[in-house]
Structures are given as structure tokens and as C-alpha cells.
Amino acid sequence: MAKGLDVGTSFIVLSSEGESGTVEYKDFRDAFYVIKPTTPIASKMIEKGLVGKTFVKDTDGSYIILGKDAIEKAVERNDSAKRPMYRGVVSSKEKDARRVLSYILKEVAGKASKKGEKLVFCVPAQPVDQEDDDFDVGYHEDVVKKILEECSYDSRAINEAEALCYSELADDDYTGVALSWGAGMVNVCVMLSGEPVVKFSTTKSGDWVDRMAAVATGETDSVVQAEKEQGDFTIGRPSSDNQVLAAVSTYYDRLIDYTTKQLAVAMEGHKALPNFKDPLPVVVAGGTTKAKGFVAHFEKKLSENGFPLPVKEVRHASDPLHAVARGCLIASQIL
């Protein structure tokens, strides 16, 4: 049995083929929160309160809570959960990032059904809007491969937006443009007849919206994230009733404007771009694209900001939260 794994900044998604031939998914929030008890009694009470939740007890007696439970605990304490990843790769900002990512990946992927089981996972492309040395895809890929090797998988990495192309462009002869809007980055792939000809990323996405809205309103990132995911707002129409959602709507507008300008600059005159004879489908996926009005606003900004390729349509992936994981599974099945 082959598997696919979307190793995202905000979510880890495992895809596998079910008994009936359908694709099954396992989602896990890519987050952690540490509670350090002050007394032995507090330690016992905290552990009782964590029954049924996913956590690891650390060597110093603290509790590392994982997944959605980490977000809930952080919000309860008016704090922000942490992540082992930042902008699509293992975070250099968290000293425990590699260890926590190992806990999470092993929780999600589990042990291989047999030694050498095929698994394809996704990695981001090099960003076009960041020129420093903080972004290291190679190290990130090696870390993930090592963790999966410990689970007895034979793993291979592919580009995140390339995986989205495999998932969503089958009816378009695998020709078009795919954008995966994750929490940390936007990954872009231009594909021609199944060949990825241009791949790059930009470094602002859903997390940037949360951070800027948090700064504007004085809330924590986790509170903003929770309100954004549960709230009712439309991009470009700030709410007058909720200042957090009003800020989120405003920064979504800025994010889409920024990204479409980066797309135009990165692709204009790109030597690897073919001369496409027909207009191209543009597919968007990822949790950031779930906001109301996203597709229409993105299509409008593409046109306004001079996207250099002919566009047939802009459409949502059939399953925006799972499309990349599905593409990884498709790649794994043909290896």
C-alpha cells in the first residue's frame, strides 16, 4: 500500500487508499503547547485533565500537548500555541522543533504496513521574495525522510504545488497553474503535459494574516486563528461587529494583492515558461483559500496586477484541504 503525506505548517495530512478504492485522510493540527507543572500535585492533576488528549510527558516533567488540543489549551490560557514548522520548513525559531515534528509525524503516519512501504511527502519551493539563508528546504527534507525512515517507510519528496497539479489537473491534460495556499507560504507550480516547468513560493499566507490581525487588535495569534476559522466574514467586506474578523478581512485583501503582484513579477519573462497556445486553468487549494470570496477576489487581483499567462478559469480544488495529500498519494502509487 502506498501513502501520501502533506507536511504542512498548520496541518499534517496523511492520505491512503481505502478498501473500496476511495482515498482516506487523517488530519492532524501541526501545533504544540507546553505546560510545566509547578508542584507534584499539579502534575498529577494536569495529567488527569489530559486524559483522551494527545500529549507527551517530557524528561523535565512538563507536558507537550500536540495537535488541536494544543490550540485549545493555548486559547484557554490566553496564550499562543507553537509550531515545529515555520514557513513550510522545520522551524529554526523553536529549539524543540525537530523532536516535536517527530512526535507528530509518527502519530499521523504510524508504522509502515511493511518495511519499505512507499510514501511521498511534499516540500515547499524556494521563495522568490526572500533572499537570506534562513530558508533551507534540503535540511527540512532530510529531517522528514529520517523520521519516516524510523517508521520503516521508503519515502520521497515532491514539490507541494506539483502534488496539487497531479490531484487537480487530470482533466486538463496536466496543464495549468496550481497554487497551494498553506499557513506559512504560497507554493506555485506551472505544469505542461505533466512536466513541472516553473516552481516557486512566496512567504506570506494564512499565518501572516493571523499575525497582522493579532497586532492590529491586541489579541494572540491563536485567538485570531480560532475566530478566523469559526467566524463568518467575506474578503473585502470588513465586519463592523467584530474587530478581529474586520482585521482578518483587511489583511486577506492585502495578502491576495501582494501574492498576485509577486506572481506577475516572478513569471514575467521567465525563460522556462512555454508559449501556451490555450488559456490555462488556475487551481487554488489550502486552508487559506476557504474564506468566503477568496476565488473571486483572487481572480480579480490576478487581472488587475498583470498576471502574464492567459487564464481560462480560476477554480477551487475539489477538496481544498486534502488535495495536496491526494497528489502525494497519486505520485506514490506510480513510483
Each predicted region: which residue ranges?
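Nucleotide/phosphate-binding catalytic cleft detector across ATP-hydrolyzing
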Residues: 1-58, 62-178, 193-202, 206, ...
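A structural feature that tracks compact, well-ordered secondary-structure segments
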Residues: 187-189
